């Protein structure tokens, strides 16, 4: 597996009920979050994200995915999984604006692993508290479709929203 470069892109192919909703293409912030970029691209190249879902969607805020537990039909476990390790925070000056890719974590700053979120609106209250490590270059319309889906009381979409992530140079 190759090291990510300035030209590295990720494509998240999103589907629901067997129909493709579209693609979200990401570029990375190597300069401010190299560890997070390397972690995300490594997991994607290993196929870790394939078959996981966007398990948390909050209109006016973000869509969250990357949890291996989201492959389990039991939604109670969604949002609790990771890759089996944690990575050190790389808080930086990139603002959490619409389209920014950032790592989800627990209350512990150094607890990120595989779960990530894409802001669908500006969320400056997250600045310097969560690691922004990329941004959407195309496909925000797909993120908007996902965040607009009907959801349960835990902000889990009622229809499964599955992803496949590929890395290109």
What do the PLM-derived regions correspond to, one by one?
Residues 1-169:
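Cyclophilin-like peptidyl-prolyl cis-trans isomerases
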